[in-house]
Amino acid sequence: MASDVLVKCVVWDIDNTLLDGVFLESAGEPPPADPVLVAALRELSNRGLLQALASRNPPEAAEYVRNVTGADFAAVECGWGSKAEAIARIATDLDVPVDAIAFVDDDMLERAEVAADLPDVLVLSPEDAADAVDWPQFSPAVITAEARRRGRLYAERRSRQAAASVFGGSRDEFLRHVGTRITIAAATPSDLPRLQELSVRTHQLNSAGEPVTEAELSHLLASADYEVATLRLADDFGDDGLVGAVFLAGTGATSISVPLIMMSCRALGRGALDALLAWTCRAAAQAGATELTVPCLVTDRNVPMRLALGVAGLRAEPGSVAADGRALFTRSLTGEMPELPGWVAVEAGK
């Protein structure tokens, strides 16, 4: 694992790791939690890192650990199969890249298996994990209120997915059924920390394909040459807060460019990116533009962003990828505009 990759999820073993003993070998009350590792887990949770369990234990072991640690585990894999496979499932379930996962286990053989099968995972002993709170991979530059709620947000996500799995209607009908609320508004200086966090953490839904510095974001917010809008997302399951933003350049010109559009992966499948792109097209047209352009860095990870651009009517010419790896997506603003769903509220811009 590269030293500059920020860990997004820590997967913990239970026996002799989070617990000071073996769950199934206790004659009476299960063993207590390891206070040092629980302190590390809580500190990392407060920094916005997701916590998960992968253990050769029955499900009740995970419930016990949840109770004694007070942790909001975003994913739990209890069973007798390969831990490498369990970690891969966790990565898929949480939509976290494997190279952004750390795995903590007391068993040297388990660590060796995971290291061999998933070489991009950062594999740690419990002793290493206790020190990891001081490592740069575990220290986000920005810690926002959304970050501190991340574990709970993923718990809400599981409840939402469970409800969707038994709902008989379409996606849009489900979004209405659960009271989806999207608010698009002009960004303010107080949004800067969250915008910086989104810039660093978003990969699949990020047109720039690379982080933007806090200084650059601050300049864009303050500049009269740019309009910056944020998107907040909530429903009956909970409030996700600020999950997306779009930056428009050249407002008032016949061609408006979008140097950056980004969205948290938590918003995937919930209509948020479609709504933000529809608003962007309509806002650009209302400003007098006849064309909208979005330069998008072509990466393996941001395929969902490029697909969403296509759904919004933006097209890149075949073979149009420039030397810097960016393709220019364009659409005319003189025809029919994408519709905004009824659950989208738009506040006044700057």
Protein language model features and the residues they cover:
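A short helix-loop-beta-strand connector motif used in the catalytic cores of GNAT acetyltransferases and
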Residues: 4, 46-50, 218-244, 304
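Asp-based phosphoryl-transfer active-site loop
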Residues: 5-24
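Acyl-donor binding region in acyl/amide transferases
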Residues: 236, 242-320
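Short amphipathic alpha-helix that is part of the acyltransferase structural core
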Residues: 180-211
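Metal-dependent phosphoesterase signature
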Residues: 19-33, 206-207
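Conserved Lys-Pro-Asp/Glu-containing loop-to-beta segment of HAD-superfamily phosphomonoesterases
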Residues: 87-108, 114
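Substrate-recognition element of Asp-dependent hydrolases with the DxDx(T/V) motif
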Residues: 36-67, 76-81, 191-194, 208-210, ...
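Terminal substrate-recognition subdomain of acyl/acetyltransferases
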Residues: 93, 121-122, 126-178, 285-350
